[in-house]
């Protein structure tokens, strides 16, 4: 073939490709039933053309004079082909200078294009922070994040906000914390100096504060550990748990530098042993009051408190006066499974929930650790409270003028019910808010909270009012085992007075109760709107004869309700211990709220699906308040229904279903691992575990049954087995709680072999 012929062929092929490409581009266009035209004659001429040619005149195009938009009366709304004949007829009109059929144009927002969440940061443990990004690898897991990333993408990262962690010290020279360390938010109350550095020991006992601070303020993009929720905030440490704690010390740390510190995060409290009743002393209480009145230049300090880890001990955080305070935001935990973890306590004062550790195989929380190290094993409500504090720091950066009560309202109004809806105990109160004794108003949603706090739209809540309701003629009433005292409390909520209340916030029932066995008491309060709240559930380990002395039982479950009407209080003992006796000596009902409805509550709260992908696991029927345990699943056997027993050995002040057939292979591997601990030959890493150890299935299930039988636990101070669960959780596949419980199960199996 000659050079000329080859050149002609190449040219022809190129022209053909160009023609194909041009037609391909045209084919991709979506033409719409709209024509733009330039008509110098103005609106009268445009109207005449429309009438003559079969168009509807849609009007002038923006501010362009003599440019009009038309819609043809007999043409489809969208088409892949242009209507050239219609365009030609319009453009051929002498009154039209130019005409063109409109088509869809693809446009992209010119924001910074972001990689996947996994690639946002170079910190090595970022991809393990499952609670900040949806990293689930299993379809059965619910959506797992606190919606923090959308807030960061707005440029809100905690700048200008100061948080102090009240704990056992802070390793402030840690390379993932140092850049955000604030010495003005720090003090050592154990050694009375300005250096909160923790005391090192062989077991790293004082790691707690550093871990909590890291969750809040770990530096981003520094190739170290992970990323803090408010990674540009300033963080300080108060060292106070590594020594003697007094009321004076607590008052000093709660009121430390309130003009500088915005948020105080505390992951500790009285002993979570299921038998302690204790709250702030006189001085600490005054420090709380001073903080909310004078802190942050009068806007009020934000106090965040972990709700407690006494679940296994059958504890109830209504007996903890720190989480039960109207001045604190009490935060509970949810596991990676979206369930209430084994250590979580139930009470009517919990405001909201954050993520933390759960069952033995669940992921835990990532943070900084002692000796400039990192950890992925931070646990308990200790880990939940700092996450909440970080989210509140984001809100304060967005709106520094938020008051302490604004923050509580924001939490109530934006926390999510949907991701935790698989759990029992949810109820809708008289104001239309979903609430639960385990989770408060639900899982924190950082984006929703920050969006609502936008200073351009947020209206600060009205002035706080307090109305006290009591019966001056009340005579002490006797209570015995299997008995109940019912008190009807009619109230007009101080109507007509300066302190009248029409919209509730906190409700306190202050009482003095003398009783021979305090832990057998059950207290329920029903509001005028019909919301029933358990103020105190039974605590099997609480054998104290001391009762309650002017104790404030606090509830947030009636938030937003109108209190006018008759309230009903029930105090009962259904233990069957016939020797029990006592009396209700005094009581008063304290209503906290506002005389007018807050602006954001004038429209009802609308709940939307948090996780549309993972709704197939839903199916929880409506149940009564979680404190009034009622099984919600069919087919519960007697042992499962009865499994609410006392718990085991006390813990410190820090707030660190049987399927049919064979046990799961994962369960058997865990058991085999535990069996191997006492045999050196089986500990060799070179010998992989067999798929299924030789454990008779009937023994396996018998051991599980024994773990859940109340008869094995009654009056036992040293029990390790109590899961503090109701019938609902007993129908779930059994999950190991920790190494001690695993070993206990193994020991039971060995007894039979």
Curated annotation (Swiss-Prot):
Species, as recorded: Bos taurus
Sorted UniProt keywords: Calcium, Cleavage on pair of basic residues, Cytoplasmic vesicle, Disulfide bond, Glycoprotein, Hydrolase, Protease, Serine protease, Signal, Zymogen
All copies of domain P/Homo B, residue ranges: 460-597
Cofactor(s) for this UniProt protein: Ca(2+)
Residues at the catalytic site: 167 (charge relay system), 208 (charge relay system), 382 (charge relay system)
GO BP annotations, alphabetical order: peptide hormone processing
Gene responsible for this protein: PCSK1
Any Pfam family the entry gives: Proho_convert
Protein name: Neuroendocrine convertase 1
Disordered, as annotated region: 617-657, 676-695
Residue span, Peptidase S8 domain: 129-450
Top-level division of the source organism's lineage: Eukaryota
Phylogenetic classification of the source organism: Eukaryota, Metazoa, Chordata, Craniata, Vertebrata
């Amino acid at each position: 073939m000659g050079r000329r012929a080859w050149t002609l062929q190449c040219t022809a092929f190129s022209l053909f490709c160009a023609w194909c490409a041009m037609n391909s581009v045209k084919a991709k266009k979506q033409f719409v039933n709209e024509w733009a035209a330039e008509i110098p004659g103005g609106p009268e001429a445009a109207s005449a053309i429309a009438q003559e040619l079969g168009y509807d005149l849609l009007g002038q195009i923006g501010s362009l004079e003599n440019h009009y938009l038309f819609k043809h009366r007999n043409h489809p709304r969208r088409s892949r082909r242009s209507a050239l004949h219609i365009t030609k007829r319009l453009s051929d009109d002498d009154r039209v200078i130019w005409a063109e059929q409109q088509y869809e144009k693809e446009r992209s927002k010119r924001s910074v294009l972001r990689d996947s969440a996994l690639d946002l940061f170079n910190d090595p443990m970022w991809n393990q922070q499952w609670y900040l990004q949806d990293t689930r690898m299993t379809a059965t897991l619910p959506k797992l994040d606190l919606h923090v990333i959308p807030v960061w993408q707005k440029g809100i990262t905690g700048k200008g906000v100061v948080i102090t962690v009240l704990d056992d010290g802070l390793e402030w020279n840690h390379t993932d914390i140092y850049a955000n360390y604030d010495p003005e938010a720090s003090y050592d109350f154990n050694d009375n100096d300005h250096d909160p550095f923790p005391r090192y020991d062989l077991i790293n006992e004082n790691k707690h504060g550093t871990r909590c601070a890291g969750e809040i303020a770990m530096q981003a993009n520094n190739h170290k550990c992970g990323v803090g929720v408010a990674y540009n905030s300033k963080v300080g440490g108060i060292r106070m748990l590594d020594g003697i704690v007094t009321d004076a010390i607590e008052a000093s740390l709660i009121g430390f530098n309130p003009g500088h510190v915005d948020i105080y995060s505390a992951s500790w409290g009285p002993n979570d042993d299921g038998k302690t009743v204790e709250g702030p002393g006189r001085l600490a209480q005054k420090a709380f009051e001073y903080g909310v009145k004078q802190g942050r230049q009068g806007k009020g300090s934000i106090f965040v408190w972990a709700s407690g880890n006494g679940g296994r001990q059958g504890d109830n955080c209504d007996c903890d006066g720190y989480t039960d305070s109207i001045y604190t935001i009490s935060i509970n935990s949810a596991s990676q499974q979206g369930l209430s973890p084994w250590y979580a306590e139930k009470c009517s004062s919990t405001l909201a929930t954050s993520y933390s550790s759960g069952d033995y195989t669940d992921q835990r929380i990532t943070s900084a650790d002692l000796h400039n190290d990192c950890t992925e094993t931070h646990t308990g409500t200790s880990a939940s409270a700092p996450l909440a504090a970080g989210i509140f720091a984001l809100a304060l950066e967005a709106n520094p003028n938020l008051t302490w009560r604004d923050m509580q309202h924001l939490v109530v109004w934006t926390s999510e019910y949907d991701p935790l809806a698989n759990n029992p105990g949810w109820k809708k109160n008289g104001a239309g808010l979903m609430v639960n004794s385990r989770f408060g108003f639900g899982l924190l949603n950082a984006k929703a909270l920050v969006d609502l706090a936008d200073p351009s739209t947020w209206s600060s809540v009205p002035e706080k009012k307090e109305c006290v309701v009591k019966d001056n003629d009340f005579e002490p009433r006797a209570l015995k085992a299997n008995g109940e005292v019912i008190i009807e409390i009619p109230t007009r909520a101080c109507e007509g007075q300066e302190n009248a209340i029409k919209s509730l916030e906190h409700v306190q029932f202050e009482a003095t109760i003398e009783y021979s066995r305090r832990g057998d008491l059950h207290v329920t309060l029903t509001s005028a709107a019909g919301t029933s709240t358990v103020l105190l559930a039974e605590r099997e380990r609480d054998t104290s004869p001391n009762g309650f002395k002017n104790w404030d039982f606090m509830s947030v479950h009636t938030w937003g309700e109108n209190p006018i009407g008759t309230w009903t209080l029930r105090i009962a003992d259904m233990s069957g211990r016939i020797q029990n006796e006592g009396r209700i000596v005094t009581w008063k009902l304290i209503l906290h709220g506002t005389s007018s409805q807050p602006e954001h509550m004038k429209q009802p709260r609308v709940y939307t699906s948090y996780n549309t992908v993972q709704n197939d696991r839903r199916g929880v029927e409506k149940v009564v308040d979680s404190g009034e345990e009622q099984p919600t699943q069919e087919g519960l056997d007697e042992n499962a229904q009865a499994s609410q027993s006392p718990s085991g050995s006390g813990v410190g002040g820090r707030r660190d279903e049987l399927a049919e057939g064979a046990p799961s292979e994962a369960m058997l591997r865990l058991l085999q691992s535990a069996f191997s601990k006492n045999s050196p030959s089986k500990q060799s890493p070179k010998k992989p575990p067999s798929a299924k150890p030789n454990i008779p299935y009937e023994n396996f299930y018998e051991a599980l049954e024994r773990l859940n039988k109340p008869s094995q636990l009654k009056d036992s101070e040293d029990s390790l087995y109590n899961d503090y669960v109701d019938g609902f959780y007993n129908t779930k596949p059994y999950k190991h709680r920790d190494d001690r419980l695993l070993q206990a199960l193994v020991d039971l199996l060995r007894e039979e072999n």
